[in-house]
Amino acid sequence: MMHFTSRTPAVSAVIATNGKRPELLRVAVRSILEQSYRGFVEVVVVFDRVEPDHLEDIEVGENRALKIVSNTRSGGLAGGRNSGIIASSGEMIGFCDDDDYWMPSKLTQQVALWRENPEATAISSGITVRSGGQDIVRLAPERATFADFLRSRITEIHPSAMLYSREDLLGVDGQPARIGLVDEELPAAYGEDYDLLLRATRHGDVLSVPEPLILVLWDRPSFFSGKWQSMVDGLSYILRKFPEFEQDPKGLARIAGQIAYAQASLGNNKEARAYARSALRRDPKQLRAWAAYVVSTGIIKPATLLDLVQKTGRGL
């Protein structure tokens, strides 16, 4: 729940980066600083295990701030985001990947929606995915519950679109936070955004502006290509952490199918087929499980299927 102290509460946007995309990083930072939102906007850029780029060529306008910090916690995305959250000052906190872009009215529309629905646990929006030379609009559901997230990751609700309440992430007046920080125990931070959404929706729903308010660039090598073990470890961790998946056979089948595909991509064909069977017992239409069987035969390479899926603006 968001407790509004003004009509235009201060917003902090955290960008965690490894510094390898300096030009895209600048585009992301400027897109946040140039928001039409009338309230205070702060961008916190967190450099992870690299020398910080102080972005001195970026103009910072009135009622805007740019803060450059280093990741002082565990290495990787989760620790980077947490370092940024702790260093931030806004009543609302959002994230932006270092190669994504916020549309000018993002904060204005999201804060207005939250003011109308203060009981919401977080606010999101639709996205535009740029992939294969085309832009694909993916609209998020106007309301998403804990049960919805057990059934589906709902990839239209992207981490770069999210806004959370500061007190929900950090607590207030010595009281523990309802949601808490990003989980740094997740192996390779795989699924850290999904874990955060599951924890958040235990306390209330995520509402989304029914417009694409961020641009997500997928015209680059897949983050998951070659990182299949992280996928196996991360998803297995999430299943252990959220026993509620046992209450939703299709949701459990979805994750079992993802693990099956990752195991097949690693060449662990016995494990892949075991997870695929488990998934198909719960949901015979689980395509990831069928895909795992195909990959386990060696007929098609895992990266080939993944690239085909990503060209539709969807993830595995």
Language model segments and positions:
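Short, acidic, metal-binding catalytic loop of nucleotide-sugar glycosyltransferases
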Residues: 30-40
